[in-house]
């Protein structure tokens, strides 16, 4: 996999190792600050544009539950405030799925044992 074809969306708390990897591999990062400034639609369209420019035809879409604000997705072991709102998350997923390029998906960082408030994480 070409690291330049990795897109991180909704980042807000990176450790030194993660930051070094991002810089070394030149990963595309869309922070929550950027999302608040430009909107999730801008981020989704920018990624779609890059996919088209790079002639990418097969995408693996990995959804990290801890990208969602823990008030709405407590079912994760890595809770960091100021994450994606449920509507932003759903809008982004719809944008990416609309490309018809998704060939595989996974869901990571989901811990249903911690999803103690009416299973709101699972219902997203």
Language-model features, listed with the residues they occupy:
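Mid-sequence, gly/pro-rich, charge-dense loop/helix-turn segments that line enzyme active sites
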Residues: 1-16
């Amino acid at each position: 996999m070409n690291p330049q074809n990795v897109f991180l969306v909704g980042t807000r708390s990176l450790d030194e190792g993660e930051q070094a990897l991002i810089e070394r591999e030149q990963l595309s990062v869309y922070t929550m600050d950027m999302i608040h400034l430009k909107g999730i639609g801008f981020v989704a369209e920018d990624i779609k544009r890059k996919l088209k420019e790079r002639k990418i035809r097969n995408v693996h879409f990995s959804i990290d539950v801890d990208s969602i604000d823990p008030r709405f997705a407590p079912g994760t072991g890595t809770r960091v405030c100021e994450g994606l709102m449920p509507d932003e998350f759903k809008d982004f997923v719809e944008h990416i799925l609309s490309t018809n390029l998704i060939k595989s998906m996974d869901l990571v960082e989901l811990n249903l044992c911690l999803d103690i408030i009416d299973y709101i994480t699972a219902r997203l």
